[in-house]
Swiss-Prot record:
Organism phylogeny: Eukaryota, Metazoa, Chordata, Craniata, Vertebrata
Organism name: Gallus gallus (Chicken)
Gene designation: TNS1
Keyword Transmembrane helix found: no
Protein name: Tensin-1
Region (Disordered): 15-55, 467-505, 569-589, 666-686, 724-797, 934-956, 982-1077, 1156-1437
Subunit architecture: Binds to actin filaments. Interacts with phosphotyrosine-containing proteins.
Enzyme class: hydrolase
Biased composition (Low complexity): 580-589, 763-773, 1156-1169, 1208-1220, 1421-1435
């Protein structure tokens, strides 16, 4: 580890690992020491830093061996120790400091440990939060946010609370935290805090700047920019192709060096290059090419090492950390002053710089051939050398620094490697009570408490593979339980107590504090916001490449296993818990899976072992728990040292009250897994962060992730994401790329998350979205830019908190997602909210692009969307909103000049629609407008071209000419850097002749200059037609949220993105990349939560209110959008009005609607809910918009997914002509060329109209994304089991199409379509409702349903005893006598578990989990798409919840009859997925149904697998021969095993069956073609169990009850021997003896189950017995006490009726025993139990 020294593990057989980064004995370590020249600021332009800080001061500061304790402010104390401190004196100092703090502050302080974890720190202080990260490094953005939130929450909880920052090593860590908190607290900007902020600034400049690292300053710059909105979020993944070193460092005696790169994403290695041998005089630079491009998203660390020639050590040449959210150029340059280590190293040339060349796709960049190295540079690809493979960070914090097993030698030297983690804890030595074996339970259990303090997320070696698999843990992972927090509904903000400043005062304060930190520093990446100066061939200046060419979502990024030509570093601990492992480290068990961790490395709030009082596995957390500070939620992954998780973010309160935690991190939002466990009352801030593993994680490419939130939030999450896997070298680059993308998709399938999940994050964060082209923070704002006034109003603390939340969400979005459990938050964990799981921040990219989730309207048709009523709906836009000029009835199909493609769903706005003026483009804001009842036409406005920045905000002036609008919206597209010519070329490629005149700037290989010709605005590119294949793909996969991993090749995607013409470039502003919206959080009008709420409100307090209070203002932008998008509140509109979603073009045609940045192909058909193609969007010239029949809009509003458009020019599939379908042609088949049978068409489905559920069309385009629509199938199909355990509420009406949106759907019925979506649904779900259901029994533990013990929830498998009087004999006909009748408290149908997650893969499986893709027509395609042939070796496709892209193979036009008649209207999984039924029950359900009927259940024989039972027309011949006689109806139900693996789910034993990302995908594919099944599956449109119940006659109801049985908890009182007595006398006698007995018997709670087999008693606590069974034939009588005596309960809850049954004494044929019980649950009265027993006895022929 670049962090500590080697530990001698005396207690274990392990030998110390070699530390390859130690300098050779005689070598001086110039690079490791902060030398005097440190005074040179990383950015020469930071004039405010005084040059007076001399070298001697710097050296003295760093070399000082004294403890340094400074009161930065009265309530923030910094305690710093030099890294060279001797252990003995260090321990002594620790004790002294602890004594001083206790004497002065008592227990009112929290110690934030920013260094390695230590046992003594945990023991000496009452409250410790571990946020450590490696010395001299910078923490993940999300960790910075977590720390700030934790500090703010604690400081605001009470006036006497104090924060202590503990650091051992370089002061840079303190500086990052202090500077970040200064910016964070500046948001609230109260006058009484000005002095504190000034003090923080002073501390930072005096103590930290001289010794800090450039990357640390860069991250502070990111954080402040994201908070203020000055940095626009780029939430797209980037593919790194080249790393060019200009200038050769002299690390060899004769000059030159032997460099090799290691790239880390979220502190996990994702790439290791070969070793380049460069002679000092050979040339002036080296180009390290990564082929195919390496997908990067989130927090990136690139470390360049020099491999010594004859010594087995390596030197660090330079190190640089950056976050992709702030990279707005495809070519960025870091000068020497920006490179960690190198900036003070004389061996690195002064003029040296490092250039990174990115693109939006993995394919080779055309025109970069000149970057090849000369013949004198040789490359050694032998990366098996441990020196090269060694990961310096894998063991960070695995063990405590002061662990008794060994001592730390030279703790200060980075590069020391900790001993590999032992397989067990050390018992008493390490503070544990007992030594515990750490099981590598990659399949199912979690590691238990041991894990809590150990596998740091970052250490999880297999992250790469892990990420890939969306493995479906069939329920073992409990991670989401604790880790996820759902959105906070928003607690009332506590008064802040600070005077709010007026804008003038605020400006004054700003002037006072100006110059702090990096505000004045130039942006750390060299992309200047303004026109970029031409690049100089050499020199320290950076190349400014402002052109922001990325269109969100353009390249189908799937974070999948990526392959580099050189294998990735080996991932050592292949343990199921590693971050990568998507399995969830179950938090209950103490481990979290990365997924639930939300992909954030959790800051380990108390890493369960850091708090002193308690077993080592608990942090002070226990104490805090005891003190009520926070819930005992084991820190999952608590040991992740470099955890990106916010503490706050990471903790998801388990409590249902989301709103209690004002500072809940974005994770809550994102990851919002609604899983909160009710009982805790602890404040969120103290909860151990749950690493949401990549929940929200990284939606990588997830469609929903693209949100424009402030990078901060998103970035954080991403940081934790697992990186794409490096595939084996054997596969081709294209395949690797494809795999990588798929993996992305899988991961992305969340948040959100995030982040992510979310995970991804859905585009919630308002903060980033301000659209105004804002100059980069460091540059003055161009006068013309319409940026929001700096402080339009003083935001309240709640708003600030909220904005932070939004940021968090954003971070999540960016974080690389791990899909596994991450995307699967367990079923709704909150009782009051159906939890939609993040699909992975998470969210999975629905379409494989980063599409922006469009908010979904989840409204039963009787309600209108509640947009208008949402307080947030009022546009808080920085600039004046454009009047809603045509918001009423006239359809507006104006073609906007710059045509950023927006999803054209516009419904007509109703008068006064309120839109978010500044809605982040990232969220496809649906316009909240409603159409008047009379004009229910679907307006489709032609989407503006993708080039327009995705700004949702219109310029200040009212409706200006389109020209002006586009001008203001578009910033000049100045491309500089290696990529410039490429972009320009691409643009010209698809432009009309006029457009092609835009000259491209090219850089000549020789001089690194760009030849730049002035760009001319081009005319809008003609609309790209959506290819029918895409449509068919969507149609075919309604439930699986099919992602089209490759709708078009990356090249096409890239070209498409860039083809957007730079229309109207203004010379003044910088072109903001689409999707990068810049809205200061404060402008959103969000109501932040007050941190005090966390501490003050008991957790259960507001539980029921979340869904109920429709008046409460949305807590967060996300929430407001969700509310707006869903019709959760009835009454906002006249009941029958259709909901109108208007997606106005940005130019203001619909001024008041939300602008939806997502591009929608102008001609691509939108399919109406009823399945008919409404008609394609009008082509550019089409004068009329398509009109949807009113009923389609009103009743079914958009359920069908939008089709993702494919670039026409290069796509290999045929595109349909732009002509629009007229409304009258709704029924006409829309045949897809891919399906000869026309399967792609949608047949109108008459039933569809009756579906009240409405989901917005699932096409989400990321704002700015090139015209490709990112489509999410908006069917209400729950995410596949692999993804979220979906809350299955039968009533759920719609699934939010993308996680970002529905995350907070308020509608009580909306089942999250994809886990990440409804992640935070607010509807309250009663514990008995199906929302609690889990996919498999194992999953029931921690989350809501897992909380069965706490909530009293009974597993759905055994109904409670019916209490309806009509049910019992002697009363009227038992209507509801069937076991699942409504009389049962559990409710029917059985709660639908969220589909199960895939199990975590075992270590062995993980390493083989790289799917390969074959290519068709030069495009990568999955085996499915290439003709369904069996996957080539090892090429199983890992679809994340989506089906293969059928658009790959082009077929002649097809006849309509084969068109897939798949219904998009409703989620059908609740009908066919019955996890808890037995094989026999499945046969009974199916044997009388038509062939093709099927049920999928959890396999009882194979853990983690599923059983598919399907009815066939005739049994196999072998069965016919064997059973020539008798009834063969049971044989007509055939059974297949669906196995889960890292690649997904597939039918076992069928070689030509592909792997599917989820059960939904498997089901929908087999409903289209049988593949290996006997016939096609017929997707049911109603619940077979309901049908069976309807058909059953009342006469056999007793039989049905017998089969299923009933159960409940009762009090067992006593057993009295009766000899041969039975009947009422026996009961009476037993009661009499019991009541007079002395002492009175103690009542014990037992589970009382009655079935056809008899009565079974289970003592849950095993006090008296474990289980007793009384066969039915031994039970002779059962009744209430004839004398109606009562039992007095000890809990004082009142008397309870007594009842009993008489059974034969075991081993006797004559003697009886009377067993007495008292009723326990008022809902299960004794009379109901007795009646049921009697009924069962009657059914078996016995008498009472």
């Amino acid at each position: 580890m670049d962090f500590g020294s080697v530990m001698n593990q005396a207690a274990t057989p392990c030998s110390p690992a070699v530390n390859y980064e130690l300098p050779s004995p005689g070598q001086s370590i110039t690079k490791q020491v902060d030398t005097p020249d440190a005074t040179r600021s990383p950015r020469g332009g930071q004039a405010h830093r005084k040059a007076s800080r001399s070298m001697s001061v710097t050296a003295a500061m760093e070399s000082s061996c004294e403890l340094d304790l400074v009161y930065i402010t009265e309530r923030i104390i910094a305690v710093s120790y030099p890294s060279t401190a001797e252990e003995q004196s260090f321990r002594s100092n620790l004790r002294e400091v602890a004594h001083m703090l206790k004497s002065k502050h008592g227990d009112n302080y929290v110690l934030f440990n920013l260094s390695e974890r230590r046992h003594d720190i945990s023991k000496l202080h009452p409250k410790v939060l571990d946020f450590g990260w490696p010395d001299l490094h910078t923490p993940a953005l999300e960790k910075i946010c977590s720390i700030c939130k934790a500090m703010d929450t604690w400081l605001n909880a009470a006036a006497h609370n104090v924060v202590v920052l503990h650091n051992k090593g370089n002061r840079g860590r303190l500086g990052v935290v202090v500077a970040a908190y200064m910016h964070y607290s500046n948001i609230s900007a109260s006058a009484d805090q000005a002095l504190d902020r000034f003090a923080m600034k002073r501390f930072y400049e005096d103590k930290v700047v001289p010794v800090g690292q450039p990357s640390q300053k860069r991250y502070i710059h990111y954080f402040s920019g994201l908070l203020s909105g000055s940095i626009k979020m780029n939430n797209k993944p980037l593919f790194l192709h080249h790393v060019i070193m200009h200038g050769i460092p002299n690390f060899e005696s004769k000059g030159g060096c032997r460099p090799f790169l290691k790239i880390y994403q979220a502190m996990q290695p994702v790439y290791t290059s070969g070793i380049y041998n460069v002679q000092g005089d050979s040339q002036t630079g080296i180009c390290i090419t990564i082929e195919p491009g390496l997908l990067l998203k989130g927090d990136i660390l690139l470390k360049c090492y020099h491999k010594k020639f004859r010594s087995p050590t390596r030197d660090v040449i330079f190190r640089v950390q950056f976050h992709t959210c702030a990279v707005h150029d495809l070519d960025i340059v870091f000068g020497k002053e920006d490179l960690d280590e190198a900036f003070r190293d004389e061996r690195f040339p002064e003029y040296g710089k490092v250039e990174f060349v990115f693109s939006y796709g993995p394919e080779k960049i055309q025109g970069m051939e000149h970057l090849e190295n000369g013949p004198s540079v040789s490359v050694d690809y032998n990366t098996s050398d441990p020196l090269i493979r060694w990961d310096s960070y894998e063991n960070f914090n695995i063990q405590r620094e002061d662990s008794t097993e060994g001592t730390w030698a030279e703790p200060a030297l980075p590069g020391k490697h900790l001993e590999k983690e032992v397989g067990h804890t050390q018992g008493p030595l390490d503070g544990s009570l007992y030594a515990k074996v750490k099981k590598k339970d990659s399949l199912h259990g979690s590691i238990g408490a041991v894990n809590a303090a150990r596998l740091p997320l970052s250490a999880a070696p297999n992250h790469v593979e892990h990420t890939l698999s969306v493995s479906s843990d069939s329920g073992n992972s409990t991670a989401s339980t604790k880790t996820d927090r759902t959105d906070e509904p928003g607690a009332p903000g506590a008064p802040t107590g600070h005077a709010v400043l007026s804008p003038e005062e605020k400006r004054e304060l700003d002037r006072l504090l100006v110059g702090f930190g990096l505000e004045s520093a130039p942006p750390m990446h060299n992309h200047a916001p303004g026109p970029a100066p031409a690049r100089l061939p050499a020199g320290p200046g950076r190349h400014v490449v402002p052109a922001q060419v990325h269109v969100n979502g353009a390249g189908t990024p799937l974070l999948a296993e990526r392959e580099t030509d050189i294998l990735d570093d080996e991932l050592p601990n292949q343990d199921g818990h590693s971050v990568g492992s998507l399995g969830t480290l179950s938090s209950l068990d103490g481990t979290t899976t990365a997924s639930e961790a939300g992909f954030h490395e959790a800051p380990r709030v108390g890493s369960l072992s850091s708090l002193p009082n308690g077993p080592a596995s608990y942090n002070g957390a226990e104490k805090m728990l005891k003190e009520g500070l926070y819930e005992a939620e084991p820190l999952s992954n608590g040991a992740y040292p470099y955890s990106n998780q916010n503490t706050l973010m990471g903790h998801h309160l388990r409590d249902p009250l989301a709103h209690l935690r004002p500072s809940a991190s974005a994770q809550e939002h994102l990851a919002g897994y609604p899983q909160r466990q009710p009982a805790s009352t602890s404040p969120a801030w103290l909860q151990p962060p749950v690493p949401q593993p990549y929940l929200y994680g990284y939606d990588l490419p997830s469609a929903h992730r693209s949100q424009s939130f402030p990078a901060v939030g998103t970035a954080k999450y991403e940081a934790n994401l697992a990186l794409p896997q490096a595939p084996a070298r054997s596969t081709s680059s294209r395949e690797a790329v494809q795999r990588g993308l798929n993996s992305w998709q899988q991961q992305g399938g969340s948040r959100p998350p995030s982040q992510l999940h979310d995970g991804g994050l859905e585009s919630h964060s308002p903060s980033l979205s301000s659209c105004s082209p804002q100059p980069s923070p460091l540059q003055p704002m161009p006068p013309h830019s319409h940026s929001m006034p700096e402080f339009p109003r003083a935001p309240s603390r709640r708003e600030i908190e909220q904005s932070i939340e939004a940021l968090d969400v954003l971070m999540l979005d960016l974080a690389p997602s791990v899909h596994k459990s991450q995307s699967v938050p367990s079923a709704a964990t909150r009782q009051d909210k159906p939890a939609a799981m993040l699909s992975s921040l998470s969210a999975q990219p629905l379409s494989g692009h980063y599409a922006q989730p469009t908010p979904q309207v989840v409204q039963p048709r009787s309600f209108g969307t509640s947009v208008g009523t949402d307080p947030l709906a009022k546009a808080y836009s920085p600039g004046p909103l454009v009047p809603a000029a045509r918001s009423t009835a006239e359809p507006d199909y104006t073609v906007h000049e710059y045509r950023e493609t927006y999803t054209p769903y516009s419904y007509q706005p109703v008068p006064e629609p309120r839109s978010y003026g500044s809605a982040p483009a990232s969220i496809l804001p649906l316009s909240a407008s409603y159409s008047p009842a009379g004009s229910q036409q679907l307006l489709v406005s032609s989407p503006p071209s993708p080039t327009a920045p995705a700004q949702s905000q219109l310029p200040h002036k009212g409706l200006e000419s389109y020209e002006d609008l586009s001008r203001s919206g578009e910033e000049p597209l100045n491309l500089e850097g290696l990529v410039a010519h490429r972009v320009a070329g691409v643009q010209s490629r698809e432009k009309s002749p006029e457009e092609s005149t835009v000259p491209a700037r090219r850089r000549t290989p020789s001089d690194s200059h760009y030849e730049k010709s002035s760009p001319e605005p081009g005319s809008p590119r003609s609309p790209t037609v959506l290819s029918p294949e895409v449509v068919s793909t969507i149609a075919a996969n309604p439930g699986g949220r099919p992602k089209e991993p490759h709708l078009h090749s990356y090249k096409e995607a890239f070209e498409e993105m860039e083809s957007a013409s730079p229309s109207s470039l203004t010379s003044g502003g910088v072109r903001s990349p689409p999707g990068l919206a810049k809205t200061p959080l404060s402008a959103l009008g969000l109501k932040p939560h007050n941190p005090a709420d966390i501490l003050l409100h008991p957790v259960g307090e507001l539980e029921g209110e979340a869904g109920a209070d429709s008046e409460e203002e949305p807590r967060s932008y996300v929430e407001s959008v969700a509310r707006t998008a869903t019709t959760g509140r009835a009454g906002n509109l006249p009941a029958a009005q259709p909901v109108g979603l208007e997606v106005p073009a940005r130019n203001g045609a619909f001024g008041n609607s939300f602008t939806v940045p997502s591009p929608v192909s102008t001609s691509s058909p939108i399919h109406s809910v009823d399945g008919a193609s409404l008609r394609s969007y009008p082509s550019e010239g089409s004068p009329h918009g398509t009109v949807t029949p009113p009923h389609a809009v009103a009743e079914t509003a958009y359920r069908s997914p939008m089709v993702s458009q494919t670039p026409s020019a290069h796509s290999s599939y045929q595109t349909s002509s732009p002509s629009s379908f007229q409304a009258g042609t709704l029924g006409s088949p829309y045949a897809s060329p891919d399906y000869p049978d026309g399967r792609a068409g949608f047949q109108p489905d008459p039933q569809a109209r009756q579906q009240p559920q409405v989901s917005v069309v699932g096409v989400h385009a990321l704002p700015g994304s090139p015209r490709t629509l990112h489509r999410t199938v908006a069917t209400n199909t729950p995410p596949s089991p692999g993804f979220g355990r979906r809350a299955a509420n039968p009533a759920v009406a719609s699934v939010p199409g993308s996680p970002g949106l529905g995350r907070h759907t308020v509608s009580p019925h909306a089942p999250p379509g994809s886990p990440s979506l409804a992640r935070h649904q607010m509807a309250a779900v009663p514990p008995g409702s199906p929302m609690y259901g889990y996919s498999s029994p194992e999953e029931r533990r921690p989350t809501l349903s897992r909380q069965s013990s706490a909530s009293g929830y009974q597993p759905p498998s055994t109904p409670s005893f019916p209490v309806s009087p009509a049910y019992y004999p002697g009363t009227s006909t038992p209507h509801s006598s069937s076991p699942d009748s409504a009389a049962y408290r559990q409710g029917s149908p059985t709660p639908q578990p969220a589909l199960p997650e895939k199990r975590r893969m075992s270590a062995g499986e993980r390493s083989n989990s790289l799917p390969n893709y074959a290519t068709v027509n030069g495009k990568a395609s999955s085996p499915l798409s290439s003709g369904m042939s069996s996957p080539s070796s090892g090429s199983a496709v890992a679809f994340s919840h989506t089906l293969p892209d059928f658009s790959k193979f082009s077929m002649p036009d097809i006849s309509p009859e084969t068109r897939a008649n798949v219904k998009f209207v409703q989620d059908t999984s609740k009908y066919w997925y019955k996890p808890d039924i037995s094989r026999e029950q499945a046969i009974a359900l199916l044997k009388d149904r038509e062939p093709g009927a099927f049920i999928i259940r959890d396999s009882h024989s194979f853990r983690g697998a599923y059983g598919l039972a399907m009815k066939v027309a005739s049994p196999p011949p072998t069965v016919m021969q064997q059973n020539k006689k008798g009834d063969i109806t049971n044989e007509l139900v055939r059974h297949f095993l669906i196995e889960t693996s890292p690649r997904g789910v597939k039918l076992k034993g069928c070689p030509n069956e592909p792997n599917f990302g989820c059960l939904s995908a498997l089901v929908y594919q087999h409903s289209i073609m049988p593949l290996a099944l006997p016939c096609k599956l017929v997707i049911p449109d109603r619940d077979p169990m309901e049908e069976k119940k309807d058909a059953a006659s009342t006469t056999n109801s007793a039989t049905d009850l017998l089969k299923q049985g009933a159960a409940c908890n009762v009090l067992f009182i006593n057993s009295v021997e009766m000899e041969s007595l039975t009947g009422p006398q026996a009961i009476s006698k037993a009661v009499a003896e019991t009541l007079v007995a002395d002492p009175t018997p103690t009542a014990t709670i037992v589970h009382f189950k009655v079935s056809a087999q008899g009565i079974t008693l289970t003592d849950n606590q095993r006090k008296l017995f474990f289980r007793r069974h009384y066969p039915l034939n031994t039970v002779t009588f059962c009744d209430l006490d004839p004398q109606e005596r009562k039992w007095t309960k000890t809990d004082g809850s009142g008397p309870a009726k007594l009842f009993g049954f008489v059974a034969r004494k075991q081993g006797s044929t004559t003697d009886n025993v009377c067993h007495l019980f008292a009723e326990l649950d008022p809902d299960q009265p004794a009379a109901a139990i007795v009646n049921f027993v009697s009924r069962v006895m009657l059914g078996s022929g016995q008498k009472r």
